[in-house]
Amino acid sequence: MLSFGSALLFVLAAIVVVAARLFFSKPQVAPRQPPPPQLSSTKISSQPLPATWYGSEKIHELERRAIFSKKWILLTHKIRLPESGAYIRYEEAGFNFFLIRNNEGIVRGFHNICRHRAFPVVTKDNGTAKILSCKYHGWSYGFNGQLAKAPEYQNLKGFDKKKNGLFPLHVHVDERGFVWVNMDAKVKPEVSWASDFTGVDRLARHEPFNLDDYKFDHTSQEDIDYNWKTLADKYSSNSKIEQLFTGEESEKSSRIISDFYFPNAAMTFSPHFFIMMRCNPVGPARSSVEYEVFRHKDASDEDFNQVQDIIKRASEENKSLPNPSEKNFNTGILVNEAPLYFQSQVRQLLEHHSGLEELAKKEIRPAQQVLDQTSEQDESLFSSCSGLSCGKLAKELAW
């Protein structure tokens, strides 16, 4: 028989058990998670961007994640890719990639990284290839990015060629033949081309210019020692490039139109040529201005030579632009709505992406490729044969 004390302890224990069961049987309400930040309206802010945003490494990296990894970038025209195997290499905000026309006539884009040792697959600025071949260990790829040959590795147990193709980019060729890319690694990019640019390839003011009458002529590049947004501020007003035509040239080129395409591209059409320009971020305080020039089939040398004068004047203007990181740059209010609209878009995209990262408690890199489990296993196979240390493979591929 239990003593009185033992019986009391038994009763108390039973009460605790029953109370615990009642408590834990109640539905538990999960803590409410704050909603993800939403992009604000496109209303133009009256305040310019802070001067520190034009020289900060932190802002530069955030722009790579929030803008250049998510937005559509205007690159070139399909005129430059006239046949199967024709390719062009690009670098945009630190991303190295290339465009290539496949055997079906479709323009594809890929990160310029071999899946074996990250050596560049394309080493020339442009050309025509029969196959995409990495010169490091002989891996080769078809024009659709699929792995065609991986010496020795393709015979390893568990190696899946289908999982080791080149990392693709999203490519859109619009109705006028202009080529756009999006770095977002998702199967479907977060930002669709149509959401940003519907109708830009159907503008009535572009109709006088038949692009079938133009051919690619040359590229030009200029390195400058300030932030890419300084240039985009300038060119976001469509009239800026048009103003480079003065005097006699203006009379000869009465039909000249210019357009800016966020975040960093501009285009100018004339009856004699058209120019595509990009402000490419190289670093927080360094940029590259890159031109692609196309010539009309009927343009005389005299008319076409205007291009060099225009680029020369643009270069002189670029060198004279104020440096936004200088003291007192943003003490006043900018009154030109074009730069303010551009800056408002930059501000909204950076603040929105920063909010997402704060919620996730980590950096979000939309362009970063995510390997599935099979690909991760393949990567471990590569690491087991480091460098040229795999006997027979070393002798075969050590060129």
Question: What is the meaning of each model-derived region?
Answer:
Residues 2-10, 16-19, 23-25, 100-101, ...:
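C-terminal catalytic domain of Rieske-type non-heme iron oxygenases
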Residues 13-124, 170-173:
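N-terminal pre-ligand scaffold of iron-sulfur
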Residues 34-39, 143, 201-204, 251:
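Short, flexible segments with low predicted structural confidence
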Residues 50-51, 63, 76-77, 160, ...:
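Short, solvent-exposed coil/turn linker segments
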Residues 55, 163, 310:
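Soluble or luminal CAZymes and related metallo-dependent hydrolases
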Residues 70-81, 150-155, 258-263:
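Short Pro/Gly-enriched beta-strand edge/turn motifs at strand-loop
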Residues 81-185, 191:
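Rieske [2Fe-2S] iron-sulfur-binding domain
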